[in-house]
């Protein structure tokens, strides 16, 4: 009986140490990413001129390839991306205020592109290649955002991802980010 109690006590101690270590790591990961939003005003008056450049960047980035489901509306999302962990569904990036990015700010869009975080701070899956887009300049993300706001709004709810446990958790995603992602800042040559 004493052996069983000792074994249970040791197991609980190990679980507590692992949980404590996990919380410390998650705190470090959050701090490591730095400030989540570089806040600066978005000049709505310049939006039409900037949107022209954004249209080019969105085309070069081939955003429609992922954010348009077969037979669906452009940029309305819903396309499934199969991975060995399950299926990730792309989001609606039209200007719809309820289901798209129409209620986002330019800073929210920058946060998604640069830090891989949604408007609400949720970590995004790297099926969205923010690991590469982190190098895009703020001016370029503002231009892309201006263009996407000019796209016809499509009210289409985002499908939930169909990922296996534990890959469907923010904790697993945080661990992946700690190992493989660091936000970067691209500085073009002058």
Walk through the language-model features, giving the residues of each.
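Electrostatic cytochrome c docking/interface patches
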Residues: 34-59, 173-190
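Alpha-helical membrane-targeting segments
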Residues: 24, 29-33, 159-187
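Gly/Gly-Pro-rich "capping" loops immediately C-terminal to redox-active cysteine motifs
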Residues: 70-106, 124-138, 161-172
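C-terminal capping alpha-helices of c-type cytochrome domains
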Residues: 23-29, 105-119, 132-158
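N-terminal type II signal-anchor transmembrane helix
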Residues: 2-37
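The canonical Cys-X-X-Cys-His
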Residues: 54, 60-70, 109, 144, ...
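Conserved N-terminal glycine/acidic-rich loop preference
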Residues: 26-47, 70-85
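Solvent-exposed, acidic/flexible segments
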Residues: 43-51, 56, 86, 102-106, ...
